[in-house]
């Protein structure tokens, strides 16, 4: 059990038998009336996001989530295979569980997999990854009034928007949360 004072981003709550992860929270102390906590909760299994308000001091049941470092090995038909870095056990995860993260998965990449009672819940990619551009059209200078972008396909097959000076073969740093270009990687 956790009090609303213990709320933090990433905490997983068990509400009515379903697991919800706190993505945002705010303690509110109005001029009149009791304090409360406004939260945004994401359903761990379905990905659905809801707003929920808790009275300050209320106790809420938490779920035990074990985050383990794993290495992405390969895709096997309809599943993604990850190996636990501690006990070398292999876990076959469904495309639904992996979600949009598959757009940035490279073989040998270390990712965190969250488990609850032995069952995988979701994966957490690093905030940024380095990927090579496999295809992009050449950017033309001077054909616009402001700085422009163009689509580029990276080695995982994902398409991201990049500045016009990026060429095929360049290595980029990409934000995995929103698929945005962060910069070029030298070397």
Curated annotation (Swiss-Prot):
Q: Which PROSITE patterns match?
A: EFP
Q: What is this protein called?
A: Elongation factor P
Report if keyword Cytoplasm is assigned.
Answer: yes
Q: What does this protein do?
A: Involved in peptide bond synthesis. Stimulates efficient translation and peptide-bond synthesis on native or reconstituted 70S ribosomes in vitro. Probably functions indirectly by altering the affinity of the ribosome for aminoacyl-tRNA, thus increasing their reactivity as acceptors for peptidyl transferase.
Pathway terms, separated by semicolons: Protein biosynthesis; polypeptide chain elongation
Name the gene behind this protein. Answer: efp
Give the family this protein belongs to, as stated in its UniProt record: Belongs to the elongation factor P family.
- Tell me where on the tree of life, at the top rank, the source sits: Bacteria
**Leader peptide range in chain numbering:** none
Q: Which UniProt keywords apply?
A: Cytoplasm, Elongation factor, Protein biosynthesis
Gene Ontology cellular-component terms listed: cytoplasm
GO BP field:
peptide biosynthetic process
Q: Which CDD domains match?
A: S1_EF-P_repeat_1, S1_EF-P_repeat_2
The organism of origin for this protein: Mycobacteroides abscessus (strain ATCC 19977 / DSM 44196 / CCUG 20993 / CIP 104536 / JCM 13569 / NCTC 13031 / TMC 1543 / L948)
What is the protein's major site of localization? cytoplasm
* Localization in the cell: Cytoplasm
| Cystine pairings recorded for this chain | none
One of its Pfam families is: EFP_N
The entry lists its GO molecular-function terms as: translation elongation factor activity
